[in-house]
Amino acid sequence: MSKKNSQTSPQRQKMHVKKGDVVQVIAGSDKGKVGEILRALPQESTVVVKGVNIRTKHTKPQQEGESGQIVTYEAPIHSSKVMLYSEKKKIASRVGYTLTEDGRKVRILKKTGEIID
């Protein structure tokens, strides 16, 4: 019998958020911060949120005469640590799915009933 390698690429998970959504961080050192999703990475189930999980990177000079730099960037966080956020009502909510009158499936905020997309 052949044994499956557990290190193969993980299955893509369905994520409750996507690029452009406004979310609130619900766990970790950045708990309570609100920001927009810049990038969604479904293979790792992570998202990059603007202004959240800021990391600093010290880069060496690459060419003669160039000086080194300290670069700050947003690192990814797990998608389970964010919740969709209503900017109108200033409240975080779980996501729900419903059909509109014309038959489109849309995402809604469960607490407010607000349609997201």
Swiss-Prot record:
Residues 1-12 have a biased composition (Polar residues). InterPro entries: KOW (IPR005824), Rib_uL2_dom2 (IPR014722), Ribosomal_uL24 (IPR003256), Ribosomal_uL24_CS (IPR005825), Ribosomal_uL24_KOW (IPR041988), Translation_prot_SH3-like_sf (IPR008991). It comes from the Bacteria. Residues 1-20 are annotated as: Disordered. GO terms for biological process: translation. One of its GO terms (molecular function) is structural constituent of ribosome. Keywords: Ribonucleoprotein, Ribosomal protein, RNA-binding, rRNA-binding. SUPFAM superfamilies: Translation proteins SH3-like domain. GO terms for cellular component: ribonucleoprotein complex; ribosome. Part of the 50S ribosomal subunit. One of two assembly initiator proteins, it binds directly to the 5'-end of the 23S rRNA, where it nucleates assembly of the 50S subunit. One of the proteins that surrounds the polypeptide exit tunnel on the outside of the subunit. Belongs to the universal ribosomal protein uL24 family. PANTHER family: MITOCHONDRIAL RIBOSOMAL PROTEIN L24. This is Large ribosomal subunit protein uL24. It comes from Microcystis aeruginosa (strain NIES-843 / IAM M-2473). The gene is rplX.
